[in-house]
């Protein structure tokens, strides 16, 4: 039994000389990283619940220094909007005064 053990040890030493990375198989695992005790836990996030806005109660407010215009600028259209609907799709199409065709497809 000692002869077999000696042969295994001899082969292991030869392999470690040829392949030094095999020595990493017997190194201990590095300790797990743990934060120092003086670290404070992160603050809890504030969760705000949204409520639906009733158009009659709360109109949207715009800040005075806001760069957003109060009304949206939509170019005038040459022809009225056409609406086509199927059971799951609504297609609305129109043409602007400069010839651009605008199509809106809504999948229900």
Curated annotation (Swiss-Prot):
Pfam families in the cross-refs: Pap_E4 (PF02711)
Record key words, sorted: Early protein
Homology family: Belongs to the papillomaviridae E4 protein family.
Name of the protein in question: Probable protein E4
Organism: Pygmy chimpanzee papillomavirus type 1
Phylogenetic lineage: Viruses, Monodnaviria, Shotokuvirae, Cossaviricota, Papovaviricetes
Name of the encoding gene: E4
């Amino acid at each position: 039994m000692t002869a077999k053990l000696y042969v295994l040890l001899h082969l292991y030493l030869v392999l470690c000389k040829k392949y030094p990375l095999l020595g990493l198989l017997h190194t201990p695992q590095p300790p797990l990283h743990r934060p120092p005790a003086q670290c404070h836990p992160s603050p809890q996030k504030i969760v705000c619940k949204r409520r639906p806005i009733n158009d009659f109660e709360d109109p949207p407010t715009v800040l005075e220094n806001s760069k957003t215009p109060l009304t949206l600028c939509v170019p005038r259209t040459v022809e009225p909007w056409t609406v086509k609907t199927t059971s799951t799709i609504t297609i609305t199409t129109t043409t602007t005064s400069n010839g651009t065709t605008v199509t809106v497809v809504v999948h229900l």
